[in-house]
């Protein structure tokens, strides 16, 4: 491990020294150990990283992407590595203001020839704008002698500028104009939104150090009642570069489509070339514009369209809500309805909102139901008298006439309303992962309220059945067939008897109101005693009593089977004689438990039927000395030798001859 550290330190020695000096000038201190660890990780997962280092911000962004990809594969990236990478990336951002691009003259000759052959253009001006891949992106690893280190601390820690009361002048004096409602020091502007590609500068004007997002055409227009945006707002700090005041782009629906929003569309295309624009979606908002320079004098106010971006907070709320609660939860549906009815969402807006909020499978479902709804709506438009001139391309935002934002922004109100209804219906049919099941498998639980069961049934039918009439019939059928027995008994008198024009499901819910509560249970008990039910029908007991033969009760609860009947049956059973001989003695026709014979039919003794006493414990042999009985006539004989207590029995058994009798004890 120590050899690896020393090898990495020697390999990137000059670059490490420069990075440490760069961070120190900016007021940041990073230990050499952490930097060596960072470059070890870079060397492991980014083998393309040059030994002499690089100041190109795109290279460090690429390092971050590859480290993220390595982390997704299961590799452990220490937290200090991420912190050091972010600090170095932020420290290198000020160096991207003066970019050096490779000119077309420095490219190989085959590059220009290939470009001319592909495009068919011979002018040098057009060739410069259409150079191929040999003209690389800006190379930033140039000389570091002219670095302005005073900007670095303001970029990494902008709050220090407030404490010191100073900041770098990032915008020339010619750019100073009254700013919007939220003046910020130029040092606090986020530098992550700077363009990374080379832009051809105008030599007649001084170059601007930073370009801000959003573009000038999309920035906020301050209200006219105050010079600084709202009453009581303090003036801008002296010596700080304000935001330039942008003009507002307005689209006239009555004008031709070719001239609508040309500046806006050009800004969007340029922003896409300079950076990622996926999070900045555009929606169309109607506003009432007073007569001004753009219109004739004395003209009344007219409604015009204005494009505004989706806020990041709104996109984040929808994304987190879909992930946590589901795409069709009440929270998401309420939020989506408010967005849809509060704005003029074009097909491009709906597609962008679905892509940024739904998963891949959910977006595929949304797109499928969207296309299906468009086809049905087009058939309705053609069948209407007079015919509505709204085709499928307009509702889907496709085709040569409706594929761009400019073209969709001037859509008529009726088309916007149809797109809104179709997309909301398609969103409602999205199945969350793991929740798809057939509608006939939805059954009411024994204790589930009937309205909850009907709500689950309608929700599943809404997502799986497109036709409204078929969905209504199936819901009414399943609302009775899949209900529990209590609700079925309450609904049965209403089935097929609901008057025309009255909602069947509503009548079912009214009939099942209160089922399962304490009052309903008390009513059931009272009606069971009277033989009635909720529907007014007598519920009879179908089984027959085996004792009396009547219907309505069992034998164990038969009122005829009283105590006297039980005694009589017991006496009859006792007096009944067996059909064969006694199995014990074999001599008479009586029961075995009533047999008193002492001998069987063959004369063999039988064990008595009387109860015996408790059995005696077994006697122990050999534990005490054996005292043999000596008859009286053998008292003169010589006594036997003394035998040990435990061996006397075994020696007597081994003796072949009869031993001499022992003298009897005196009487």
From Swiss-Prot:
A lipid is attached at residue 2 (N-myristoyl glycine). It is a lipid-anchor. GO terms for molecular function: nucleic acid binding; structural molecule activity; zinc ion binding. Keywords: Cell membrane, ERV, Lipoprotein, Membrane, Metal-binding, Myristate, Repeat, Transposable element, Zinc, Zinc-finger. Gene3D superfamilies: 1.10.1200.30, Human Immunodeficiency Virus Type 1 Capsid Protein, Retroviral GAG p10 protein, Zinc finger, CCHC-type. It comes from the Eukaryota. It holds the Pfam family Gag_p24. It is found in: Cell membrane. Residues 166-188, 598-667 are annotated as: Disordered. Residues 648-667 have a biased composition (Polar residues). SUPFAM superfamilies: Retroviral matrix proteins, Retrovirus capsid dimerization domain-like, Retrovirus capsid protein, N-terminal core domain, Retrovirus zinc finger-like domains. Myristoylation is essential for retroviral assembly. Alteration of the glycine residue leads to a block in the budding of particles and an accumulation of Gag inside the cell. Specific enzymatic cleavages may yield mature proteins. GO terms for cellular component: plasma membrane. Belongs to the beta type-B retroviral Gag protein family. HERV class-II K(HML-2) gag subfamily. HERV-K Gag polyprotein contains regions homologous to the matrix (MA), capsid (CA) and nucleocapsid (NC) proteins from infectious retroviruses. Evidence suggests that HERV-K(HML-2) Gag polyprotein can be cleaved into mature MA, CA and NC under certain circumstances. However, the exact boundaries as well as the size of processed Gag proteins have not been precisely determined yet. Intergenic, closest flanking genes being RPL24 and FLJ23047. This is Endogenous retrovirus group K member 5 Gag polyprotein. It comes from Homo sapiens.
């Amino acid at each position: 491990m120590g050899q690896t550290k020393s090898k990495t330190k020697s390999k990137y020695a000059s670059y490490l020294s420069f990075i440490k000096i760069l961070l120190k000038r900016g007021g940041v201190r990073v230990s050499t150990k952490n930097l060596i660890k960072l470059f070890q990780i870079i060397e492991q997962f980014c083998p393309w990283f040059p030994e002499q280092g690089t100041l190109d911000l795109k290279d460090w962004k690429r390092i971050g992407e590859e480290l993220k990809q390595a982390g997704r594969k299961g590799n452990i990236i220490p937290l200090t590595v991420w912190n050091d990478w972010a600090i170095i990336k932020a420290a290198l951002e000020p160096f991207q203001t003066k970019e050096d691009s490779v000119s077309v003259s420095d490219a190989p000759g085959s590059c220009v020839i290939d470009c001319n052959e592909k495009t068919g253009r011979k002018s040098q001006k057009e060739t410069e704008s259409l150079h191929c891949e040999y003209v690389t992106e800006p190379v930033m690893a140039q000389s570091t002698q002219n670095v302005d280190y005073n900007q670095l601390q303001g970029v990494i820690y902008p709050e220090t500028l407030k404490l010191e009361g100073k900041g770098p002048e990032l915008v020339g004096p010619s750019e100073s104009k009254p700013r919007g409602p939220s003046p910020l020091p130029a040092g606090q502007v986020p530098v992550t939104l700077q363009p990374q590609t080379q832009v051809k500068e105008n030599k007649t004007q001084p170059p601007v150090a930073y370009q801000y997002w959003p573009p000038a055409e999309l920035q906020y227009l301050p209200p006219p009642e105050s010079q600084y945006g709202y009453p009581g707002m303090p003036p801008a700090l002296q010596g700080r570069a304000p935001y330039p005041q942008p003009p507002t782009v307005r689209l006239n629906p009555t004008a031709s489509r070719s001239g609508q929003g040309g500046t806006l569309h050009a800004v969007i295309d340029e922003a896409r070339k300079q950076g990622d624009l996926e999070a900045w979606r555009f929606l169309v908002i109607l506003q009432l514009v007073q007569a001004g320079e753009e219109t004739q004098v004395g003209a009344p106010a007219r409604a015009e369209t204005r494009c505004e971006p989706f806020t990041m907070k709104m996109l984040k709320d929808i994304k987190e809500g879909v992930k946590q609660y589901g795409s069709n939860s009440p929270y998401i549906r309420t939020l989506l309805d408010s967005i849809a009815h509060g704005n003029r969402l074009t097909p491009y807006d709906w597609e962008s909102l679905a892509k940024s909020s739904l998963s891949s499978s959910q977006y595929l479902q949304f797109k499928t139901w969207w296309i299906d709804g468009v086809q049905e709506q087009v058939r309705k438009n053609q069948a209407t008298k007079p015919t509505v001139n709204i085709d499928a391309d307009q509702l889907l935002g496709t085709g040569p006439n409706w594929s761009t934002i400019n073209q969709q922004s001037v859509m008529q109100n009726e088309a916007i309303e149809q797109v809104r209804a179709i997309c909301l219906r398609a969103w409602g049919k999205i199945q969350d992962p793991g929740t798809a099941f057939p509608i006939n498998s939805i059954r009411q639980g024994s204790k589930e309220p009937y309205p909850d069961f009907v709500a689950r049934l309608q929700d599943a039918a809404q997502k799986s059945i497109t036709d409204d009439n078929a969905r209504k019939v199936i819901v009414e059928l399943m609302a009775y067939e899949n209900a529990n027995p209590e609700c079925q008994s309450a609904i049965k008198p209403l089935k097929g008897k609901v008057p025309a024009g009255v909602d069947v499901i509503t009548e079912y819910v009214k009939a099942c109101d209160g089922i399962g509560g304490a009052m309903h249970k008390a009513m059931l008990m009272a009606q069971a005693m009277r033989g009635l039910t909720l529907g007014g029908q007598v519920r009879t007991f179908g089984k027959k009593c085996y004792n009396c033969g009547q219907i309505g009760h069992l034998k164990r609860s038969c009122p005829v089977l009283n105590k006297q009947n039980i005694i009589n049956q017991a006496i009859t059973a006792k007096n009944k004689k067996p059909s064969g001989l006694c199995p014990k003695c074999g001599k008479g026709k009586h029961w075995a438990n009533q047999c008193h014979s002492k001998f069987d039919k063959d004369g063999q003794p039988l064990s008595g039927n009387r109860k015996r006493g408790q059995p005696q414990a077994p006697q122990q042999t050999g534990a005490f000395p054996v005292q043999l009985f000596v008859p009286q006539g053998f008292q003169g004989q010589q006594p036997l030798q003394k035998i040990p207590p435990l061996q006397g029995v075994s020696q007597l058994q081994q003796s072949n001859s009869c031993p001499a009798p022992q003298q009897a004890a005196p009487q």
